């Protein structure tokens, strides 16, 4: 990865900022709970700073997407974006009062850690009944965050019909 990045930077010397969007908890360059095992429990920011002079931003992938969602729908100052991939775990980015919310240790939005199901049950539900999993996660967001809008990006549900009569 570093070799490829250096090659790109050598070709285009106008690049001033590098932004890495990673599937995992990213806290000031330290990566935790990452889908990329080579990055897990490593301070990627410190590793890159030793080799690269450009400014480096490292953020969770769904948080980056939620910033884009907010810019598209900026009239919603309090929003959330849920990403439901076909594999692994669901994530969520949250915008509160127009700003990305990471939580104390950048763990906010890790819906895969909600106590409804263990990881094996979540994997099974993602394959067999992704609608149920998504509805529980949406209900949780509504009860805790109460966003004005929730964007949903799902790789497994083509026709999303959310039914939450209790909210």
Place the predicted regions along the sequence by residue:
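Glycine/GP-enriched mid-protein hinge/lid loop-to-helix segment characteristic of carbohydrate kinases
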Residues: 47, 51-143
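Short secondary-structure boundary segments
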Residues: 22, 83-86, 154-155
């Amino acid at each position: 990865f570093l070799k490829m990045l250096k090659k790109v930077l050598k070709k285009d010397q106008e690049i001033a900022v590098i932004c890495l969007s990673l599937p995992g908890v990213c806290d000031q360059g330290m990566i935790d709970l990452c889908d990329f095992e080579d990055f897990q429990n490593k301070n990627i920011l410190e590793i890159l700073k030793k080799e690269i002079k450009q400014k480096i931003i490292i953020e969770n992938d769904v948080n980056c997407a939620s910033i884009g969602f907010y810019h598209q729908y900026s009239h919603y100052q309090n929003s959330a974006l849920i990403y439901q991939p076909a594999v692994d775990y669901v994530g969520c980015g949250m915008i509160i009062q127009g700003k990305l919310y990471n939580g104390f240790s950048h763990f906010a939005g890790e819906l895969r850690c909600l106590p409804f199901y263990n990881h094996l049950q979540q994997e099974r539900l993602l394959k067999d009944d992704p609608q149920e999993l998504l509805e529980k996660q949406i209900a949780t967001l509504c009860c805790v965050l109460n966003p004005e809008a929730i964007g949903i990006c799902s790789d497994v549900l083509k026709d999303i019909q959310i039914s939450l009569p209790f909210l």
